[in-house]
């Protein structure tokens, strides 16, 4: 409640006087349904902006991939089909190679930490913003660390992944699945349930919130192995021409509305973990905790994947090592005082 009040205060502090101008209705594309925390956060965020602008700004939301499938959301904002879009970096593999280093196995322990890392001004200016061509990035964020969920075979050890067809959430997790002996399969988020039901995949890497709430996998998932091994990164992008058309005072209002929200957004995602887990377990799924020995084996494989990815990107002339080291340093910094699923469940 206090965080919501604070966010409202920040927006209202930059409220603009009413002027005799037409209302500007902005289209916002979201690939997850209206029941999800982030979709609801965006709706409330828009309502605050509408109030702070004295009605000069309005927002029309298109949740549930109503405008286009998830992989197309970045381009919806880039081309102006949408004025704003919540997009998934992993939806277009290879397009954001440095940003996606945040998705490496065991990089961050919570959405709060991940969101704080990605919005560090120095990191963005030096490495990340240049990858987001053709849009104005309003906010970068992650979900809480994800797990592997399967339909038939429980995964209790690193060797249990061998031979299974597993949907990956990002290119880095594709490499993780392959290193564990599984077959990585690319499936858009909205098609996971269908592929799980048909047997096209044996399991999927996804966070509890996504599995239990956003994509309603209760009854389909039989086993959830709590690895908390990775986060998926997202962004809120705005069409630059739409932004440029706004009067200066409205541009300022938009800019200020997303400053200092990292903790609020991150904690909101982290809170989905318990809710999503309950939805799956209530529908019959078994939650599996790894032994310390098996957790260490998964982490060792993750280290090898990380080393290989950095070497691969450095070979392409990208500053992967410097980006990774900056992210890791920020992750350690923000771990002090933030929740981590590796230690706090």
Where do the PLM segments sit?
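Sec/Tat signal peptide C-region and signal peptidase I cleavage site
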Residues: 14-20
């Amino acid at each position: 409640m206090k965080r919501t009040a604070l966010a409202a205060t920040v927006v209202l502090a930059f409220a603009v006087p009413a002027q005799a101008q037409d209302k500007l209705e902005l289209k916002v594309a979201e690939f997850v349904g209206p029941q999800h925390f982030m979709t609801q956060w965006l709706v409330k965020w828009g309502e605050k902006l509408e109030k702070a602008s004295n009605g000069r700004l309005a927002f029309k939301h298109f949740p549930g991939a109503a405008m286009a499938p998830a992989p197309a959301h970045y381009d919806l904002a880039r081309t102006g089909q949408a004025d704003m879009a919540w997009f998934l970096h992993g939806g277009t593999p290879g397009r954001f190679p440095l940003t996606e280093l945040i998705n490496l196995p065991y990089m961050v322990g919570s959405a709060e930490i991940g969101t704080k890392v990605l919005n560090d001004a120095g990191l963005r200016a030096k490495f990340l913003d240049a990858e987001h061509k053709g849009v104005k990035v309003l906010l970068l964020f992650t979900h809480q660390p994800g797990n592997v969920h399967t339909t038939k075979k429980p995964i209790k050890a690193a060797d249990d992944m061998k031979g299974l067809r597993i949907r990956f959430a990002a290119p880095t997790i594709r490499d993780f699945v392959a290193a564990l002996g599984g077959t990585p399969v690319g499936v858009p988020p909205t098609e996971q349930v269908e592929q799980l039901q048909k047997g096209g995949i044996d399991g999927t890497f996804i966070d509890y919130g996504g599995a239990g709430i956003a994509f309603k996998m209760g009854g389909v998932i039989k086993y959830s192995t709590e690895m908390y091994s990775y986060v998926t990164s997202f962004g809120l992008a705005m069409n630059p021409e739409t932004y440029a058309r706004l009067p200066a005072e409205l541009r300022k209002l938009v800019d200020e509305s997303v400053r200092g929200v990292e903790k609020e957004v991150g904690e909101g995602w982290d809170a989905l973990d318990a809710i999503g887990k309950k939805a799956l377990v209530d529908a019959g799924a078994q939650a599996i905790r790894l032994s310390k020995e098996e957790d260490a084996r998964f982490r060792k494989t993750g280290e090898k994947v990380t080393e290989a990815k950095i070497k691969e990107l450095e070979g392409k002339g990208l500053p992967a090592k410097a980006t990774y080291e900056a992210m890791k340093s920020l992750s350690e910094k923000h771990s002090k005082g933030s929740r981590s699923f590796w230690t706090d469940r």
